[in-house]
Amino acid sequence: MSTFMAKAEDVERKWYVIDAADKPLGRVASEAARLLRGKHKPIFTPHVDTGDHVIIINAEKVALTGKKLTQKLYYHHSRYPGGMTLINYGTLLKTRPERAVEKAIKGMLPKNRLGEQMYRKLNVYKGEAHPHQAQKPEAWTIRD
């Protein structure tokens, strides 16, 4: 008997919606990364994208513990001398809350082409509304 290896064409993809309101950022990000990788499925294969589509709503209401609103920094560099940009989480949450959640999730995905494929199945929205009602997404609850 040989080990089962999933093929990309055999994977049935579902859509899940996660409500991030008043949930810790790390919990939301780790659950979303788990769904995007497909680790919740019995057919999980590390070298095949077996994950599902994930929609995250209420990104602006995500919770942080401690002093992370002022102390957690995101770095970006333009590759020009003196081109480093620092932005703290509080500012990022006010201006682009969906980007803060996306960065947390992307850091938990593989750093290769397969990780990029998985990241493309992520949709983050700052409010309640999302344009994916036609896909009939299932609600995924985050443990507290």
From Swiss-Prot:
It comes from the Bacteria. SUPFAM superfamilies: Ribosomal protein L13 (SSF52161). One of its GO terms (cellular component) is cytosolic large ribosomal subunit. One of its GO terms (molecular function) is structural constituent of ribosome. One of its GO terms (biological process) is negative regulation of translation. Signal peptide: none annotated. InterPro entries: Ribosomal_uL13, Ribosomal_uL13_bac-type, Ribosomal_uL13_CS, Ribosomal_uL13_sf. It holds the Pfam family Ribosomal_L13. Keywords: Ribonucleoprotein, Ribosomal protein. The keyword Zinc-finger does not apply. Belongs to the universal ribosomal protein uL13 family. Part of the 50S ribosomal subunit. This protein is one of the early assembly proteins of the 50S ribosomal subunit, although it is not seen to bind rRNA by itself. It is important during the early stages of 50S assembly. This is Large ribosomal subunit protein uL13. It comes from Heliobacterium modesticaldum (strain ATCC 51547 / Ice1).
